[in-house]
């Protein structure tokens, strides 16, 4: 997979950088694995906005992805690589020997016609799913379960991978993409390799309209609003915030406040916290 740059024929193509979609082998999804999806547009069950800047965008159908990989010791053939509008990663369509079809997150390097399998005693190859207890130290994994049988909950985005660092007792230490080292039960399943489409980080939408197609609405700084709309608003010209620190539109502390509970039970499973990102490298903006 590669990225594609455009000549500045128009202002929209001047900054546009997209993936070339060369790994996509079929334009139409598997009919039996798609369902309608009602888009909530950032609202909760009462219709109140809980996530701002969401709405619009192209109509989508949800692809049913197999995050459990619970068909044990049954060979599956990669029939196609499909596009998924709900994620940056690609989907691999699997045809199992018993006739069932399933989608999985497409690992990097997996080709059409390749065989993958899930089980405890399967070959150490990219795309195969197995318990963390049987994976070699230093191997890269993705689609990691937090609880056995619940399905993959971590390391699912495009280009992501975790590294098996150590094994001790009933737990396996994983180094996550955030640099956090966390203990996971050894019977939890994961898939070997990293998630494909890693070049997505080098792309650029190029224009505001393309962002609207994805369902993202404009984001306005609080400092340019009126005081009735945001705590940062009001004043003459470029006025300061007027508070000890930045806050959300609802008056809660923002930009740097730790939100994880100090007595959370899973704290004992975190061996090393993630590396702090400095304000300069983060490039945060006014909320």
UniProtKB/Swiss-Prot annotation:
Molecular functions (GO terms): rRNA binding; structural constituent of ribosome; transferase activity
Keywords for the protein's UniProt record, in alphabetical order: Ribonucleoprotein, Ribosomal protein, RNA-binding, rRNA-binding
InterPro entries (alphabetical): NA-bd_OB-fold, Rib_uL2_dom2, Ribosomal_uL2, Ribosomal_uL2_bac/org-type, Ribosomal_uL2_C, Ribosomal_uL2_CS, Ribosomal_uL2_dom3, Ribosomal_uL2_RNA-bd_dom
Membrane-traversing stretches: none
GO cellular component: large ribosomal subunit
Example GO biological process: translation
Transferase among keywords: no
Function: One of the primary rRNA binding proteins. Required for association of the 30S and 50S subunits to form the 70S ribosome, for tRNA binding and peptide bond formation. It has been suggested to have peptidyltransferase activity; this is somewhat controversial. Makes several contacts with the 16S rRNA in the 70S ribosome.
Organism of this sequence: Prochlorococcus marinus (strain MIT 9215)
Compositionally biased tracts (Basic residues): 258-287
Phylogenetic placement of the source organism: Bacteria, Bacillati, Cyanobacteriota, Cyanophyceae, Synechococcales
Name by which UniProt lists this protein: Large ribosomal subunit protein uL2
